[in-house]
Amino acid sequence: TINRINKTLLTQSEFKDRFKLIVVNNGEAINHPSGNGIIVINNENLGGSGGFMRGLIEAGKINDVKHVIFMDDDGSCEIESICRTHAFLLMAKDKNTVVTGCMLFEDNPAIIHESGAIWHRDFLHYPDKHYLDAREIDSLDTFDNERKIGYGGWWFFAFNINAIEYYSFPFFVRGDDLLFGYMHKKHNIVTLNGVASWQMDFERKISVLNSYLNFRTVAVPALISKRKFA
């Protein structure tokens, strides 16, 4: 992954010095030097949120960093998704603009898991365009239809670093990106055609602990919110 991004993005003349790749490695150290826009950070094994928050803290120490893209290490995306996101955020007038990438299934790459998600007043989140088949012509109108998004997953989540008001837990808690999105609900979260990531189907990760943590994630904003239940 490091070599691919370095070859196709960091060393390209039009993008050189515009991007930095921060790799937060949870657990055993990886043998890759930092330099030329690549920053390798060996971190304790604190899970996804721990890695993302460590990366966010380190990015904040770099003077010329304005935007950050969170990306899972077990997913994949086209370099074009990064380039489109960069171009869009450069033109955005609102610093609270966030770009979230559409998630598709890695074992069924034309099927959408979600293109952003929507918070309902029961405090559950509902994936937008869930199981839409991107190959079908009849699906294009639905896919192109913009909806008000309340949350974006960390498989591809780009934002202005100066617009962040709260940090997530510095250790793994399933659904941490849900809570992060709720805490920053004033953000204008948008989706873009051509910005996507392929991930493992979440149904393959179901467990008792994950189910508990998912419930906890939606229960917390329900308890602290002034909104009334339906």
Report the location of each language-model feature.
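Conserved donor NDP-sugar-binding/catalytic core segment of glycosyltransferases
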Residues: E80-Y126
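Short, acidic, metal-binding catalytic loop of nucleotide-sugar glycosyltransferases
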Residues: N3-R18
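Active-site donor/metal-binding and catalytic loop motifs
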Residues: T191-V208
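Donor nucleotide-sugar recognition loop
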Residues: I149-F156, E165-Y182, H187-V195
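A recurrent flexible, glycine/aromatic-enriched loop bordering the glycosyltransferase active site
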Residues: H130-F156, R204-K205
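Catalytic core of nucleotide-sugar-dependent glycosyltransferases
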Residues: V208-F229
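Active-site nucleotide-sugar/metal-binding loop of Leloir-type enzymes
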Residues: M53-H67
